[in-house]
Structures are given as structure tokens and as C-alpha cells.
Curated annotation (Swiss-Prot):
The keyword Hydrolase does not apply. This is Flagellar hook-basal body complex protein FliE. One of its GO terms (molecular function) is cytoskeletal motor activity. Belongs to the FliE family. HAMAP family: FliE (MF_00724). It holds the Pfam family FliE.
Length: 98
């Protein structure tokens, strides 16, 4: 069994000086955040509908409604933490000296 040498120039990507990073990742992160907010909105509306149905018509199970409410609450808390982190990062950017 022979060991072949590896040509690093052919394996590694070619990077030139002054090349900037692609901004596709930033757009992807924005889309991911938007999808998370849409999902959170759907969860909130489903929880509200479940509570309304349980109270008005008696449809549904109380434990399932409680689980949906807790899930909606946890998603709301997560969104609030992300919002707070974004605001804090923005404030730090404003305070940076150029």
C-alpha cells in the first residue's frame, strides 16, 4: 500500500489579498430570524384559539392548552432575549471609536 502525497495547493481554496467576506450569511440570518418570528406568531395564535375554544365551547384538553400556552410563553421569552441582545450589540457599535 503506497502513501500518496497531498498537494495542498489543490486542496485548499485560493484566497487573494483584500478579498472580503460574502454577505450571503447576513441575509440568511435575517431570513432565519423572520421565520422564527412567523413561527412564534403562529404558536401564539394557536394558543389563543385553543384557550378560546376551551373556555367557550369546552373543546380540547386543558393539559394540551396549558402546554401550548407554555410553549408560546417560552418562544416569547426567547424572542425578547434575542431582541435585548441585538439592542445591546447595536449600542456597543454606536460607542465604538473609529
Amino acid at each position: 500500500m503506497a502513501i500518496e502525497s497531498i498537494n495542498a495547493a489543490s486542496v485548499l481554496p485560493k484566497v487573494t489579498l483584500g478579498e472580503t467576506a460574502k454577505t450571503d450569511n447576513a441575509a440568511g440570518a435575517g431570513n432565519t430570524f423572520t421565520q422564527m418570528l412567523d413561527s412564534m406568531s403562529d404558536t401564539q395564535s394557536n394558543a389563543q384559539t385553543s384557550v378560546s375554544n376551551l373556555l367557550t365551547t369546552g373543546e380540547g384538553n386543558a393539559s394540551d392548552v396549558l402546554i401550548q400556552m407554555k410553549k408560546a410563553e417560552s418562544e416569547m421569552k426567547t424572542a425578547a432575549v434575542i431582541r435585548d441582545n441585538v439592542i445591546e450589540s447595536y449600542k456597543q457599535l454606536l460607542n465604538m471609536q473609529v
